[in-house]
């Protein structure tokens, strides 16, 4: 058990100053928690991880599949989603994909000793350029962006070029021009494009590393950029768009780490004998499937929500909450009762003490058959410990959050929101940000295998530092960078380009002609430039044409509908809160921030529909 000095230690204790008594005491919290976990004997299953069992081909295959590029491993070249994604990558990202495909191809050739698909068949590199596949950059680069590479093939089947990504420049950028200072974090360009000094092996020249270093006494306060297109949170995008965000994020994270000189490793998940019913040791997806039968729309396991609620009601002001363990025998008994009675609604929550609830909460996280941070991405989270500055660490974590499966991401967010509340009551509960991070870290970052103890000792302080970053910057981390949204827009546009087949072209043109004839009358009498039609099916007035100007915001439209429908059949107080969405065009669906400037959205996505409706829960 840690001393009172540890309880009062400041969250600003440095990770890089071992002589600091505060840091030593805080580390005592970490090892005390590890000891409690070992005494519980409930470490997660060892058989999930088979380190070193994946060869190069399997590693690359898993990466390409998760990046949405599995068709590059086999089959004929086409004009499908993978090719559309490739056409939108930056030069650095395309080079990273090429490296992965090349490695996969060479490994397969060695394994099978027979011809396999070569990387030049994917990236259309001429034979004369096999040694140096990157072609010279054209000096005529519009708006300062990298131009597309001009790719030629001797074959009659021509692959599309792999242009550098940039926002839809002919309309408007997703973010304002980057004016990054020590307290701002630019979302405009991919993070990998901002670490040129690292890529050239000059880490000391990196401005970000000079501005903020890990051994600074306090964490920096980053301000979220306020783009005219509005902030977009993860829950504001459609599932299909978030799936594409995941593809792009993995490619960008791998490129970003490569620029920083970090090898992105992956764990291999073996088949697990996970339970299909009950509470503890059940996969998140299974828990949610069972929960949604009782409570449709549940995004976080009900028992997890209930444990958090219990702690918030009774434990936030309790000294040593999370640190002081409950009775082992009591926790074991409560666990058994939860398994038997929770879903029958017969479990008595009044009998649960706050320290026991904290023990059950941590036990639930540890016993997930697949880690909350996911088995395949746990090494990438751990690798962020070796990044040189908090700014780059936050950027790495930002991309990793985008990569997490939805159940893991939602459950992690619920946990972090609770931990932030614990820290807010530090004066009462004596639990600083640093204390909380030290105690939570060994429950999130589980080390397994024969070298687990050594790895845990080496990564203890770094793991706790990452938890501290997750708690502190959670609002930023759950905001989708606008360079990713711009990339999705461009990907959606690339996916809608007409196919090259003449027969398919003729069919498409005929279909478009018929559709044009059907809508010709409405188009002639419809909206003029700068006017949008907003549909509001839940209002008495279900449609309204609105003239946009430079100051029109999403909140102005919702307010106007509320005013116009004030005397409708349902009063505003009875109606659920509604938000303005852009639907279709070059996005699946996006809920607009109330501060969004609509004329800018109109220019970026001129073919979208405008819909006023409640958020999906």
Regions found by a protein language model. Name each.
Residues 377-378, 390-464:
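Alpha-helical bundle/repeat cores within regulatory domains of eukaryotic proteins
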Residues 301-303, 355-363, 414, 468-469, ...:
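Conserved, well-structured core segments
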Residues 521-545:
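Eukaryote-biased recognition of intrinsically disordered, low-complexity regulatory segments
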Residues 582-617:
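Eukaryotic mixed-charge, acidic/polar low-complexity intrinsically disordered regions
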Residues 1-350, 438, 442-521, 527, ...:
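Intrinsically disordered regulatory linkers and targeting segments
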Residues 315-404, 433-437, 575-593:
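Interface signal in eukaryotic adaptor modules for cytoskeleton, membrane trafficking
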Residues 288, 292, 308-316, 338-342, ...:
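Eukaryotic basic, amphipathic alpha-helical target segments in cytosolic regions
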Residues 540-556:
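Short, contiguous acidic and Ser/Thr-rich linear segments
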């Amino acid at each position: 058990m840690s001393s009172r000095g540890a309880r009062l230690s400041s969250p600003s204790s440095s990770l890089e100053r071992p002589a600091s008594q505060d840091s030593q005491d805080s580390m005592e919290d970490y090892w005390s928690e590890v000891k409690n976990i070992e005494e519980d004997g409930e470490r997660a299953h060892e058989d999930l991880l088979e380190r070193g069992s994946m060869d190069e081909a399997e590693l690359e295959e898993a990466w390409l599949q998760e990046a949405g590029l599995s068709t590059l491993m086999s089959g004929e070249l086409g004009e499908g989603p993978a090719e559309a994604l490739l056409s939108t990558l930056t030069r650095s990202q395309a080079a990273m994909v090429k490296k992965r495909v090349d490695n996969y191809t060479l490994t397969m050739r060695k394994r099978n000793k027979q011809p396999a698909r070569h990387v030049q068949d994917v990236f259309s590199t001429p034979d004369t350029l096999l040694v140096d596949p990157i072609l010279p950059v054209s000096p005529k680069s519009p708006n300062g962006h990298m131009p597309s590479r001009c790719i030629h093939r001797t074959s009659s089947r021509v692959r599309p070029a792999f242009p550098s990504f940039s926002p839809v420049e002919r309309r408007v950028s997703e973010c304002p021009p980057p004016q990054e200072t020590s307290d701002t974090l630019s979302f405009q360009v991919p993070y990998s494009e901002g670490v040129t000094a690292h890529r050239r092996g000059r880490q000391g020249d990196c401005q970000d590393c000079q501005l903020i270093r890990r051994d600074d006494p306090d964490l920096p306060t980053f301000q979220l950029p306020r783009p005219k297109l509005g902030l977009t949170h993860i829950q504001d995008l459609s599932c299909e768009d978030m799936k594409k965000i995941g593809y792009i994020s993995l490619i960008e994270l791998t490129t970003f780490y490569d620029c920083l000189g970090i090898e992105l490793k992956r764990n291999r998940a073996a088949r697990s004998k996970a339970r299909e019913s009950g509470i503890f040791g059940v996969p998140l997806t299974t828990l949610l499937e069972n929960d949604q039968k009782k409570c449709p729309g549940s995004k976080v396991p009900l028992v997890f929500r209930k444990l958090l609620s219990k702690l918030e009601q009774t434990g936030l002001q309790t000294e040593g909450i999370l640190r002081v363990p409950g009775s082992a025998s009591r926790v074991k008994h409560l666990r058994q009762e939860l398994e038997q009675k929770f879903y029958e609604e017969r479990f008595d929550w009044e009998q649960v003490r706050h320290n026991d609830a904290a023990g059950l909460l941590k036990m639930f996280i540890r016993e997930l058959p697949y880690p909350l941070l996911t088995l395949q991405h746990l090494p990438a989270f751990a690798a962020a410990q070796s990044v040189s500055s908090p700014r780059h660490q936050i950027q790495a974590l930002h991309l990793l959050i985008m990569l997490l499966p939805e159940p893991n991401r939602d459950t992690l967010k619920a946990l972090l929101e609770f931990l932030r509340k614990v820290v807010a009551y530090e004066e009462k509960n004596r639990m600083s940000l640093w204390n909380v991070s030290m105690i939570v870290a060994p429950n999130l970052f589980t080390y397994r295998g024969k070298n687990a103890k050594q790895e845990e000792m080496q990564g203890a302080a770094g793991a706790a530092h990452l938890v501290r970053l997750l708690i502190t910057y959670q609002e930023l981390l759950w905001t989708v960078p606008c360079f990713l949204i711009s990339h999705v827009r461009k990907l959606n546009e690339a996916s809608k380009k007409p196919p090259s087949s003449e027969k398919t072209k003729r069919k498409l043109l005929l279909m478009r002609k018929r559709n044009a004839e059907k809508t010709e009358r409405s188009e002639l009498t419809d909206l003029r430039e700068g006017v949008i039609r907003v549909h509001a099916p839940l209002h008495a007035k279900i449609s309204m044409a609105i003239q946009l100007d430079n100051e029109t915001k999403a909140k102005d439209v919702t307010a106007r509908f509320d005013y116009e429908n004030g005397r409708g059949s349902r009063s505003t107080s009875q109606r659920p809160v509604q938000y303005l969405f852009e639907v279709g065009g070059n996005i699946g669906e996006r809920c607009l921030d109330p501060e969004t400037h609509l004329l800018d959205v109109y220019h970026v996505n001129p073919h979208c529909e405008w819909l006023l409706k409640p958020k999906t829960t």
